[in-house]
Each structure stands twice: as structure tokens, then as C-alpha cells.
């Protein structure tokens, strides 16, 4: 078989007025004298090409889209390629965004209108030795105006929900404003030719028997001549073949099973080794491989996950598409995002129902890393048409997603989509739940038929007496706008959000100096009812100023740096308080070992535009204050303080082993600059458990200008966990303004050592570029302690800066590695 990736000789041309659907007119657009753009790489969407040629600026840098003319035009791609004529051939488009006609050598192959589908065409009878492929994209807004829905949906189902497009391009919820509508080819275009045979499709299922043996069931679909030999093998992580089979490509389709005695099991990386096996199909000189794994996932009605019988609490985040400018997959950028997810102790990511379709490479990366995925189908926060033509599209999308992705051990569950029931309750509480037929009939039927071993979950959120009921099913953290009964210890938060700015360096990329600040102090008043400057609001989509953390706990800002700190520290405080409570999992007065909260997925991990929004990793892949607080709160061994009627010291163990050691608790007085009280006590804690180790009752009344400090040490005196808990809100505390911060760099060991003479509130580190990453940042530092920070990845040279929230002194050190001999 021969598989040709059509990744060269591509051209793009924009049209000020539509071109007639005629091959002569279309091919003339790409004559020798054409002013079409030659694509420097492929795939590229229209914005990618225009940016590469300097026609536009990247609207994501400032979060403002000025080039609306792009989505008002038709755009045409052309590719010239060589192939073998007169052999069975299949032309496949893995990503078409969105409304396009496909022409080959003068023949219209068909029209594309669903961005989530791959499009395949039988072209063997049309191919020549030299070929011309043209893909004509119609302006999306023009096509949307042609859509109509039956009268019963009027005012309930928006037109955009009848179109199968990337919805995020049609609103500014998570991108620049006004919205940025993408267009073009965003994934590979391939030509498979049967010489004499080609593998048209491979699907596989894996499961474990009751005896613990592994089964891989493979279905192969062939094109071309029959009776060509093929071989299938399954290799373990070391490359050793543990099962194989062979046959001939008779009748075009075969189903076969491979068995593995007691295979190594796949675990999320926080609880074991994510062991993968490689399934390979060979015919003639070609080979196609898939990663598979063996694991048993059971999920209770309270969404407690058990992986291979082991309870696993899910601590993670929602993953956004990487860039609003393009859906072309960027593996290096995604690798950085996944690195940051693991650095933050995340074992689950949610693939959001309104985000973009991700390629096989993403799922393989999650397989290898041991990151579990909550996988939504592509529905989002809207009611939907239930007409038969629409239901057929949803069915096709679900079938394609399952056939191509179900073999991945990283996928924990399929979910019907994002906020269908919530959209009905919030927007149209008296209306029927249009779209319920999709999530209650279409999707579950497809899942039961194609992937019966994996849980299907109807919608996120759903369950209980109302859609967002925290006490049944999953919930989304809308407590910034709503009072939600039962919110303190929900079963599972599949979203939970607050808004903050990106890092200070990224803010300077976003705004001009005049936008960043006007002289004066910003305070919430009747005449200024917003917590952020008005000039920031055009960079804050979706009314983000209503969704800040507890900024009222912080001093009013007199500079833009102080405002950035105020907003970001409030976001971090929200995570500290909320996730700390969820990790404990039960109220202090409960005499039980039950942990009510089984998972928390922060909304959201990453930003796809440089805006003020929910992401804790900004557009330039810089983690902010809230990210590092999430990292600390997701630590497998986690210490926390509950300030209710008593000050309780808690320890949570989400590892797989029993832990014993010593906990040190002290009070640090900010004004006296000393510890006023100290205690030390032993502890032992089982896996998957939370324990209240003590209260501070024996110290009686405690002055609120003190800080509770907790350090957890194992029996070898190795630090396992630590936390710092103020006794009052920050605007009432007198943090030192001269802390005597010092920093020493050891580039050869990739570390920084920091010390201070007085309590240092929120030590922040940054390099002289955007590439410097630290394993901890935005942390408090006590006098007498040495903080060791790893630099990841370590630059060869540069300058690293450190500063604190209240001391205006900036400390710096040179970073230079010795050259390797």
C-alpha cells in the first residue's frame, strides 16, 4: 500500500468576490501569473498564511481582532501532486473548516459542511500522473445566513447551533474581540493508493477478562486486490511481541482477536506506570501502528473513579484549544501544556465540548504520559435542533470519534457535551430541552454499540434536582454569579473558575502604557462599580470583571503592577480556599472517613489568546500565580488549614502508600518577625484518606497578625508538604516592606537558593525571556528558611529576577552554565 501525505505545493488565494463554480474559472486563479500565496508548510489555515506573509498582525497578542475582512471573503486552496493512475485510491481530509467544495482534475468531489468530520472521496477513476486539487471555501457568515430551522425552535435554538462549526470562532468567550472566525484546512490531506492493497481503516477495542488477561479486538478494512498477506502484532513497552496473527485481505474486512496473559496494566501517572502496548498491522511494505493499553475503570454514581480497583481522585483542569488563530496542531506547544499539567500534579484533563478536534498525536501523548481524559462530544452551552438531518450529523460525528479514538487507554469516559441542561435552565427554563434526544438517544446508542466497555455520561453538568446540583453528578463552579446549595463539598467539579490577568510580562504585550494605567488609585465606588480599570475591559471577554476572586481582601491599587497582583492573588486565594476544602472532602464536624469530593477540574488550564480570562497558563505559556497555587493544592500529599469554629490542621494522602512521620505547626508573628508558638506531633495516614491531625485550641486566642505555618516530614525528615495560612484577609495585614531577599544561582545544578530576613509575601521569579520556567513561584518565604527552586528547562545563560509583593527592591542574578567539556 502507498500513503501519500499531500504536504507540499499548496497555494492560497483570497477573493474579493465569489468565483463561479466552474473548473476553468477556478484553475485560472492559480495560473503562472497568479498572485496566490505559496504555503511555506502544510497544513495552514488562512490566518496562518496571512500572518506568515506579514499581511496581518497576530490578534492574539493584544486580544483585539481588527482584520474582520478575512472572514468576509471566499478563500481557495490549490495543490498539485503526482500519483499513480488507475488504481483504487482514497483521498482523505482530516480537518476542513468549514464550508468548502472539493474539486479534483475538473470534477466536483463533494461539499464539506461539518468541521468535526473527516471527509473521504474515492478518486481512483479520476487520478492522473499529474493532478490538481482545488478546495474552495465559502465565507462562513454567508453560509450561516442560508441556514434555517423549523418554527418550534425560534428564539430557543440559535442558528449557530445548527451549524457544525468551531463555535469559539463565533463569540469572544475565549479569544480576541470581535470574534475571530477561522477558515481553511487545519489537518493533513492524504492519498491512500492500493498497490496492490491499502488499509482503509483500523479500529480496535481492548478489555480485561475476569481472570486479568488482556484482549485486543481488531477490525481491518482494506481496499484493493484481495488475498494479499498481512500480519498483526502486539508488542509490549520493551518491544517484545506478546501476541500476533496473520491472514489475507479477502473480502475487504476482517475481525480478529489477540490475547495477552496477565498484561502490565495502564495507570494514571500519579498512581503507577502508564504501560502502553503497540499494535502494528503490516501489508506489503507499509505498516500502521496504534497505541493501546489495558486498564479497568469503574466509576460510581458519585463519580469516584477506580482504576484497576484502586481509588483515584481526579485533580486536573479543562484543556482549551491552543490558539484562536488556528486549529493546526502544534505538538511542541501541546507538549509544553502537558508538561505544565503534570508539573501541577494533574492526572485528568477535560477535552471541552466547545473546543477543537484534536488529532491522534494528542491522545497518544496522553497515553504515554498517563493523563486521563474526560472527553466531551462537540456540543456546548446551547439548545440544539432535533431534526433528523441534524441527528444524523451528530451520529456520524460520534461514530467517527469512537472509531478513531476508542483504543486509547487515556480516555476515561465519553460525555454528551457541555452545559446542555444548564443552558436550558439558565436561558429558557420554561422551554423543552431541545437537544436532549442527542445526548439521551443518539450518543448513548453509538457508545453502547461501538465502545460498551467505557462509561457514557449524558452532559456536563447533570444530575440531581437541578442541572448544576453539587450533591448529585458533576457540577460547574458558578458561585461567582449564583448561590448554589450544597456547594461546600460537591461530588465532582468538572469546571470551577475565577478570572485573573496573565503575567506582568504578558500584560505589557497586551496593552499600551496608556491602557495599562491612568494616574490615581482604583477603588470600587458608586461611580466606578468595576474592580479593574475601564481600559482593561476590552481585553476581558465574557464580562470577566464579574468573575474575579475575592479582590476585596486586598489593598486598593495605585499602580498597574499592584492591580495585577491584587487580581492574581485573589484568584490564587480562591483556589487555595476552595481546593483545600475539596481535598479534605468533608466538614470538620463529620465523624466519618468519607470524602465527599472525588474530583476537581479547574476552568481552565490554558489561554488561547492574550486576554484577561480564566486560564492559569497564559498565551505565551507562562504559568501565573493561580497556576502555582493549583500545583500546591494538587500535591499528592497535601497539608491544609480549616479556619471555622476551630483552627484544624489536616493532611490528605492521595498516594498509593501509607505515610508516617511528623507534622510541625507554628505561628509566625509578622510584626515581631518571630515564631510565637510551635508544636510537633507524629502522624500515620492511609492511602486515599484525609485526617485532622490537631487543632490549635491549646494555644487559646490567637492574634490575627500571625501566620499559621505547617510542615509535614516523613521519618527521614524529608519535606512532604507544607502550607501557610493567614489568620486575616490581606488588606488588614502589615506585611514587611523591606524583607532582605537574597538569591544565589547554581546553573550547573539548575537551582536557585532564596533566603530572606523578614517575612516575604509572594516571591515572584521571572527570567529575561518567556522561556524560563520554575518548579515553584509566587510563594511566601519565612526568615531563616532556604527555598530551593529548580529552573525548568534550564537556559544556558541569562538574568533571573526576584521580587516580592510589598518590597520594591528587585533582586537579580546572572545565570550561566559552564560549557560541557
PLM regions: where:
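Active-site region of glycoside hydrolase catalytic domains
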Residues: 177, 201, 402-522
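Substrate-binding clefts and catalytic carboxylate motifs of secreted carbohydrate-active enzymes
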Residues: 14, 184, 414, 447, ...
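Intrinsically disordered, low-complexity Pro/Gly/Ser/Thr-rich segments with frequent PxxP/GP/PP motifs
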Residues: 246-264, 666-703, 770-796
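Terminal connector regions
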Residues: 286-288, 698-737, 795-821
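Extended acidic/polar, glycine-enriched regions
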Residues: 125-132, 219-300
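Accessory beta-strand-rich segments of carbohydrate-active enzymes
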Residues: 4, 8-18, 41, 67, ...
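Beta-strand-rich binding/interaction modules
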Residues: 102-104, 213-247, 647-684, 691-694, ...
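Active-site-adjacent substrate/metal-binding segments within catalytic domains
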Residues: 56-80, 88-92, 97-101, 110, ...
Amino acid at each position: 500500500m502507498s500513503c501519500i501525505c499531500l504536504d507540499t505545493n499548496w497555494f492560497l488565494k483570497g477573493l474579493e468576490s465569489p468565483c463561479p463554480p466552474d473548473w476553468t474559472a477556478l484553475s485560472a486563479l492559480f495560473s503562472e501569473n497568479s498572485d496566490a500565496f505559496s504555503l511555506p508548510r502544510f497544513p495552514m489555515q488562512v490566518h496562518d498564511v496571512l500572518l506568515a506573509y506579514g499581511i496581518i498582525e497576530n490578534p492574539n497578542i493584544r486580544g483585539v481582532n481588527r482584520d474582520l475582512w478575512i472572514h468576509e471573503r471566499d478563500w481557495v486552496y490549490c495543490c498539485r501532486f503526482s500519483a499513480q493512475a488507475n488504481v483504487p485510491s482514497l483521498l482523505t481530509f482530516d480537518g476542513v473548516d468549514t464550508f468548502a467544495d472539493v474539486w479534483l482534475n475538473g470534477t466536483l468531489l463533494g461539499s464539506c459542511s461539518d468541521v468535526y468530520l473527516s471527509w473521504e472521496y474515492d478518486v481512483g477513476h479520476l487520478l492522473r500522473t499529474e493532478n490538481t486539487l482545488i478546495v474552495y471555501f465559502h465565507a462562513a457568515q454567508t453560509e450561516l445566513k442560508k441556514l434555517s430551522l423549523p418554527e418550534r425552535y425560534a428564539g430557543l435554538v440559535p442558528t449557530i447551533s445548527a451549524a457544525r462549526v468551531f463555535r469559539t470562532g463565533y463569540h469572544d468567550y475565549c479569544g480576541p474581540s470581535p470574534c475571530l472566525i477561522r477558515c481553511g484546512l487545519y489537518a493533513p490531506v492524504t492519498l491512500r493508493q492500493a498497490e496492490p492493497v491499502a488499509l482503509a481503516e483500523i479500529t480496535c477495542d481492548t478489555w480485561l477478562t475476569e481472570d486479568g488477561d488482556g484482549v485486543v479486538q481488531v477490525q481491518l478494512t482494506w481496499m484493493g486486490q484481495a488475498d494479499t498477506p498481512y500480519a498483526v502484532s502486539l508488542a509490549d513497552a520493551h518491544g517484545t511481541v506478546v501476541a500476533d496473527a496473520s491472514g489475507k485481505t479477502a473480502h475487504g474486512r476482517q475481525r480478529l482477536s489477540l490475547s495477552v496473559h496477565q498484561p502490565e496494566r495502564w495507570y494514571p501517572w500519579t498512581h503507577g506506570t502508564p504501560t502502553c502496548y503497540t499494535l502494528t498491522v503490516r501489508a506489503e511494505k507499509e505498516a500502521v501502528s496504534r497505541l493501546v493499553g489495558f486498564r479497568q475503570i469503574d466509576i460510581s454514581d458519585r463519580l469516584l473513579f477506580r482504576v484497576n480497583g484502586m481509588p483515584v481522585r481526579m485533580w486536573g483542569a479543562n484543556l482549551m484549544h491552543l490558539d484562536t488563530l488556528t486549529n493546526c496542531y502544534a505538538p511542541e506547544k501541546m507538549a509544553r501544556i502537558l508538561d505544565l499539567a503534570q508539573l501541577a500534579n494533574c492526572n485528568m484533563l477535560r477535552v471541552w465540548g466547545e473546543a477543537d478536534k484534536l488529532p491522534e498525536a494528542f491522545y497518544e501523548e496522553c497515553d504515554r504520559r498517563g493523563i486521563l481524559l474526560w472527553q466531551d462530544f462537540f456540543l456546548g452551552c446551547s439548545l440544539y435542533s432535533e431534526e433528523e438531518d441534524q441527528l444524523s450529523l451528530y451520529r456520524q460525528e460520534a461514530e467517527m470519534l469512537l472509531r478513531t479514538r476508542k483504543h486509547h487507554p487515556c480516555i476515561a469516559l465519553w460525555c454528551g457535551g457541555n452545559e446542555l441542561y444548564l443552558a436550558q435552565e439558565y436561558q429558557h427554563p420554561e422551554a423543552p430541552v431541545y437537544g436532549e434526544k442527542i445526548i439521551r438517544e443518539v450518543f448513548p446508542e453509538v457508545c453502547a454499540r461501538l465502545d460498551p466497555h467505557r462509561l457514557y455520561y449524558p452532559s456536563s453538568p447533570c444530575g440531581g434536582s437541578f442541572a448544576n446540583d453539587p450533591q448529585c453528578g458533576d457540577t460547574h463552579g458558578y458561585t461567582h454569579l449564583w448561590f448554589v446549595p450544597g456547594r461546600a463539598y460537591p461530588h465532582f467539579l468538572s469546571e470551577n473558575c475565577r478570572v485573573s490577568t496573565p503575567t506582568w510580562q504578558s500584560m505589557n504585550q497586551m496593552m499600551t502604557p496608556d491602557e495599562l494605567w491612568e494616574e490615581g488609585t482604583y477603588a470600587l465606588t458608586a461611580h466606578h462599580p468595576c474592580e479593574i480599570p475601564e481600559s482593561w475591559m476590552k481585553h476581558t471577554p465574557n464580562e470577566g470583571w464579574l468573575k474575579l476572586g475575592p479582590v476585596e481582601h486586598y489593598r486598593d491599587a495605585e499602580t498597574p503592577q499592584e492591580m495585577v497582583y491584587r487580581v492574581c492573588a485573589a484568584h490564587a486565594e480562591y483556589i487555595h480556599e476552595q481546593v483545600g476544602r475539596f481535598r479534605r472532602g468533608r466538614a470538620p464536624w463529620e465523624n466519618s472517613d468519607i470524602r465527599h469530593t472525588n474530583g476537581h477540574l479547574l476552568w481552565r488550564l490554558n489561554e488561547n489568546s492574550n486576554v484577561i480570562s480564566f486560564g492559569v497558563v497564559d498565551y505565551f505559556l507562562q504559568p501565573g500565580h493561580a497556576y502555582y497555587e493549583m500545583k500546591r493544592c494538587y500535591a499528592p500529599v497535601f497539608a491544609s488549614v480549616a479556619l471555622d469554629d476551630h483552627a484544624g490542621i489536616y493532611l490528605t494522602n492521595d498516594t498509593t502508600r501509607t505515610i508516617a512521620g511528623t507534622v510541625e505547626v507554628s505561628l509566625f508573628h509578622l510584626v515581631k518577625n518571630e515564631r510565637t508558638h510551635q508544636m510537633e506531633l507524629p502522624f500515620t495516614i492511609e492511602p486515599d484518606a484525609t485526617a485532622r491531625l490537631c487543632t490549635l485550641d491549646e494555644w487559646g486566642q490567637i492574634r490575627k497578625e500571625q501566620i499559621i505555618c505547617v510542615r509535614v516530614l516523613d521519618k527521614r525528615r524529608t519535606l512532604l508538604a507544607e502550607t501557610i495560612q493567614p489568620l486575616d484577609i490581606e488588606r488588614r495585614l502589615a506585611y514587611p516592606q523591606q524583607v532582605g531577599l537574597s538569591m544565589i544561582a547554581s546553573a550547573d545544578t539548575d537551582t536557585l537558593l532564596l533566603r530572606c530576613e523578614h517575612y516575604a509575601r509572594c516571591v515572584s521569579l521571572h527570567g529575561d525571556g518567556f522561556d524560563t520556567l520554575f518548579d515553584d513561584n509566587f510563594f511566601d518565604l519565612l526568615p531563616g528558611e532556604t527555598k530551593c527552586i529548580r529552573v525548568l528547562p534550564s537556559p544556558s545563560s541569562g538574568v533571573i529576577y526576584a521580587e516580592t509583593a510589598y518590597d520594591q527592591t528587585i533582586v537579580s542574578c546572572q545565570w550561566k552554565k559552564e560549557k560541557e567539556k
